[in-house]
């Protein structure tokens, strides 16, 4: 499984979803290896981690040019570049496309060294890595779409990210969308066959999540504040 972040080292919901899915798969008996683009001090009992920046086996420059020849060459920068309190670079700062590219360069070697039956890649950040892993092992590729570029940017999309998403959808054996609405966007905006796109909703761990949330709500209400719940 190729991810981009994992709690507590996450900047949004993607890492939380990856944590929940990996834990659920492991509880069903799946032997899971979770790959991240950079090393972080993390360990969980249900899966093992592989950090791509520890791999020294890279593909050649010619292979790199072939891999990204279909994409634009400009860089994507965030509005601000910052470092987390733990000293790790923010996952969304700096040249994001270069980070995605570097991740993909090492994915083939990781796939070669780690036995697996299926490849699972989360969002566009990991699709090139998943594609390279599939080229090496020939195993089925499942790409998970948590949010499309249209969800993030409306109609003012970044074409480079769109092209990476499109390539991932086309080369995947299955596309997993987090909702029916996301599935429809993949079908309509990217021209992907409806038979290829399945819906798997995000789950909730009630025992883990509800009590702390209720306690937080009670503290907010005790302070005289109003609560608006969006569902």
Question: What are the functions of these language-model segments?
Answer:
Residues 162, 168-196, 206:
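A short, active-site helix/loop in glycosyltransferases that binds the activated sugar's phosphate group
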Residues 176, 219-231:
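Conserved donor-binding/catalytic core segment of Leloir-type glycosyltransferases
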Residues 153-156, 187-188, 195-196, 204-219:
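Acidic anion/phosphate-binding donor-loop and adjacent secondary structure
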Residues 99-106, 139-142, 150-167:
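Nucleotide-sugar donor phosphate/pyrophosphate-binding loop at the beta->alpha transition
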Residues 38, 181, 203:
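Carbohydrate-associated surface elements
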Residues 5-19, 42:
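A short, glycine/small-residue-rich beta-strand->loop->alpha-helix junction that serves as a flexible
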Residues 24, 28-114:
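A conserved catalytic-core segment of Leloir-type glycosyltransferases
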């Amino acid at each position: 499984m190729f991810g981009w972040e994992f709690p507590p080292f996450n900047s949004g919901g993607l890492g939380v979803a990856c944590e929940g899915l990996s834990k659920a798969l492991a509880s069903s008996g799946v032997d899971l290896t979770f790959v991240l683009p950079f090393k972080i001090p993390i360990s969980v009992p249900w899966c093992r981690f592989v950090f791509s920046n520890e791999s020294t086996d890279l593909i050649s420059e010619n292979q790199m040019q072939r891999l990204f020849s279909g994409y634009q060459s400009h860089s994507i920068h965030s509005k601000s570049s910052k470092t987390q309190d733990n000293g790790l670079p923010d996952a969304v700062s700096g040249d994001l496309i270069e980070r995605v590219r570097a991740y993909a360069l090492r994915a083939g070697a990781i796939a070669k060294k780690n036995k697996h039956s299926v490849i699972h890649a989360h969002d566009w950040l990991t699709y090139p890595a998943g594609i390279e892993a599939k080229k090496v092992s020939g195993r089925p590729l499942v790409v998970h779409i948590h949010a499309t570029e249209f969800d993030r940017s409306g109609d003012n999309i970044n074409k480079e990210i769109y092209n990476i998403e499109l390539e991932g959808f086309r080369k995947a054996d299955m596309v997993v969308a987090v909702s029916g609405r996301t599935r429809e966007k993949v079908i309509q905006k990217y021209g992907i066959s409806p038979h290829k796109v399945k819906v798997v909703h995000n789950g909730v761990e009630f025992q883990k999540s509800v009590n702390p949330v209720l306690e937080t709500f009670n503290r907010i209400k005790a302070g005289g504040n109003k609560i608006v719940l969006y569902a």
